């Protein structure tokens, strides 16, 4: 079957946009084809710095013929209805329609509309230019003399050529006939800008790939990544070094080159006195190069990696001198950048962190929430308050919190913001701060995401909790909350961080008092937003536990009870409830609860009031009523005592004992008895069952 080959050749596309653009191209073209009834066998998109390409395999030569019967008005209908039917069906008169009789509706007109399938080539010529003109680049530009004209093409960088061919592999494909802003789709593309800049004639995808390879272009981004990674590892191995792999950098570099050539450079060993993270950030950010690791650990490095004074660079050029000039040029730039970093390192060390704190008055955290200096004061107070909860020394927690943001005004963090916290730890260690304080300065930002490590040091946990709760309460107090997919201040991440910190430390930190303490630092009353923020935590806890296999409805069932703000106890209760419902007794108890709840809902609606009074034992007529009442009293008391003792497994066992008397009650007892007093008493007994389950969870929230 015929294939489509499409290539859009332009100036350099930013690396960060290439993957998304290739996927957008694939989806836009294939969706447009499917909408028009053209199915295909497979589609794959490609990207390089200078081109987007798409191969769609297994398309039909033409679309299928369509036969449609369109029902019209009744025979004898008003003229306006008849004329509207004729116009919509494309008929000249009613003579072209059929009359169909319906036993119930009488006779009515039916138009038979037959549309022959369109040639695929014609459809492609229609949809491709429209897709190119409306392509969803995050940023785009106009260029050339035509740029001032209305409706001028916008592209990420100037578009120079379009290849668009369609046809079977066994025949010569045809050109898809269309033009976009003077660019005629054809068979001509171009190779590597320097190594093979001449035109290349391509007709089909099977010829396209090898033609580009001969022209020094590797079309597939994943293959370019594999080449870079393989060659970089080989170069490092040959020198007895290890490559420090970096997936983000690898993805970016693969988007900067069409013909990757991997080379090795070096820098003066004296620069290794700089922290390895600084060397890595310098070489990565400025030169897009990979650093190398020395094979043996340095005892003085305190567990941190020891880098080698060498780096891997990736060129887009196979130079005649073997890359010597390219390496020398990169080494000059790396030397200059590392010299700057060394200057920052030596300058920053001269000023203790505590002496930098006044400068935080000049940094605005948020226009509604004040400066970083004010924030540091709030975090320090919270960290001291939280310290006993997590087993930290209050003085160390407060000290760490006061120094936690001091590195924001250092030269190094000013140049490399991603090193905040880490540089604070280095400077704190050098000025003799306790290890727990230094570690907390680095770790208080953690966890930065679902996969990030959670701090375990008590001081680190105290400061991290204080930092995140201050952020959450602050933004809630000024009504700057996440909405939909928008979360500019990463508040969802902060809430998830609090949850993971609390659970990881096994900390008993009731949220409502903690939120009140944080609100006090902002001069705000938490009453206006505490419930909403607690609900936000519940939603984040659902996400966290669901990722671990827990049921979201069980979390709802526990949070529906009043006063559930102790995250550790909520999780323990959810886990115990899940284990109960995994048993036969639990499943049957839930079924009995639902039966009782359904009866109560119907009867309470009918009666206009709740049946939540205590049942009268004197009105029990059957032994099953007495047995259930006694079981409910015993189970409720046992469950409440177990919950008070935080023995949630015991509470669930107490409820599980209700299964047999509940089953027997529904087997033998008619709730809606003819005697009104007996009916009332039996409904009260069901109300007691509903109340008893509330000792552990709101069973009405449980699904399934």
From Swiss-Prot:
Enzyme class: ligase
Coiled coil: none
Keyword entries, A-Z: Aminoacyl-tRNA synthetase, ATP-binding, Cytoplasm, Ligase, Nucleotide-binding, Protein biosynthesis
Catalysed transformations (reactions): tRNA(Gly) + glycine + ATP = glycyl-tRNA(Gly) + AMP + diphosphate
Protein name: Glycine--tRNA ligase beta subunit
Superkingdom as given in the UniProt entry: Bacteria
Cross-referenced NCBIfam families: glyS (TIGR00211)
Origin species: Methylobacterium sp. (strain 4-46)
Gene Ontology MF annotations: arginine-tRNA ligase activity; ATP binding; glycine-tRNA ligase activity
PANTHER family in alphabetical order: GLYCINE--TRNA LIGASE, CHLOROPLASTIC_MITOCHONDRIAL 2 (PTHR30075:SF2), GLYCYL-TRNA SYNTHETASE (PTHR30075)
InterPro entries assigned to the protein according to its UniProt record, in alphabetical order: DALR_anticod-bd, Gly-tRNA-synth_bsu, Gly-tRNA-synth_heterodimer
Locations listed in the record: Cytoplasm
Subunit structure: Tetramer of two alpha and two beta subunits.
Gene Ontology CC, one term: cytosol
